[in-house]
Amino acid sequence: MKKLLTCIALGFATTSYAVTPLWMRDVQISPDGTEIAFCYKGDIYKVPAKGGTATQLTTQASYECTPIWSPDGKQIAFASDRNGNFDLFVMPSNGGTAQCLTTHSASEIPSAFTPDGKYVLFSASIQDPAQSALFPTSAMTELYKVPIGGGRTEQVLGTPAEMVCFDKSGKTFLYQDRKGFEDEWRKHHTSSVTRDIWMYDTQTGKHTNLTDHAGEDRNAVFTPDGQTVYFLSERNGGSFNVYSFPLNTPQSITAVTKFKTHPVRFLSTSSDNTLCYTYDGEIYTQRPGVNPQKVRIDLIRDDQEQISDLNSSKGATSATVSPDGKQIALTLRG
C-alpha cells in the first residue's frame, strides 16, 4: 500500500491582527509634522508622527509607492502600477478615490509638489531634448510637471533630477543628479558616478553644485527658513547619515546623526523643522538638538494565507526525522 504523506502548508489563519512593520520605504513626514506617510508591502499608509496605529490608504492589488504630501497636507501623490506601468496618482490624505494624472507608457515617479500646490513634479523617461548629449536610455530620466487636476505634462529639465525639494518661494529647488547606471542601493560606492546635491534656479535656469564629493550625497531637503540644507551622505567612511550645511557656505558640513552599521534613508522635514528618516527598517523623527526618537507603529493587516492541508503520495525528497522521533521534515513540490 502506498504511503500517504501529509504536509501542512505553511501559513497562518486568516485573521486581522496588529503587527509592528519593518523595512518601510518612501517615508515622508507631512508639512505640519503631525503625520508620516510610507510604503509597506506595496500599499500606502500614514501614521501619527508621535506613533500609533497606521491607516491604510490604498487597497489595490497593484504596487503603490513613493507617497509625497501636498503643501497644505490635504493630498498625497504616489506612483501605482495598477494600469501596467507606474503612473502618477493623487488622492485625499485622509483616504478616498485616487485620480490618475499621467498615462504615458513610461514609468512616472513623483518627486515633489510645487509650493503653490498646483503641480506635481515627477521623473520619467519620455523624450530627451533635441540638444541632449546624454545616451538615450530609460535609466536616465527627465524631470516633468503635471497639473494637480491632470492635463498636459511639461518638461522642467532634460537631465536626471531626482528627490526634488523646493524652497518656500518656489524660485529654487534642490535635487540629486544621476550620472550613470550604478545601483542606488549599493553601499560605500566611491567614484565619479556617485550622486551629488545641486540647486536649480527656476528663474535663471542656473544649476549650482553644492557637494563635490567622491562618495554618495543625496536626498537633500531645506529647513523651513531655506537657509540650511540637510542631506544624506556616506562621507567620513561610514554608512549613510544625516548631514547639514548652511546654504551660503556649502563646504561647512556638520554631522547630524551618527548611526553605525546600517544606512539612514528616506530623509524629509516638516515646517516645524522635524526631521524624519528610516534606520535599520524603522522610522525615526528628530528635532534640532534632540536625540532621534523611534516611531512606534501598529499596523492592522488581513493578508496572511489560510492554512490548508496538502495531500501527496509521491515526490517527497530530503526527508529527516526530528531528534524526538515525532516529526519529519521533508521537501515537496519545490
Where are these regions (language model features)?
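Residue-level detector of Asp-centered blade-edge/turn motifs that repeat once per structural unit
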Residues: 31-32, 71-72, 115-116, 168-169, ...
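Membrane-embedded beta-strand positions in outer-membrane beta-barrel channels/transporters
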Residues: 26, 280-282, 318
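Positively charged n-region of N-terminal signal peptides that target proteins for export
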Residues: 1-4
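Glycine-rich phosphate/pyrophosphate-binding loop
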Residues: 310, 315-321
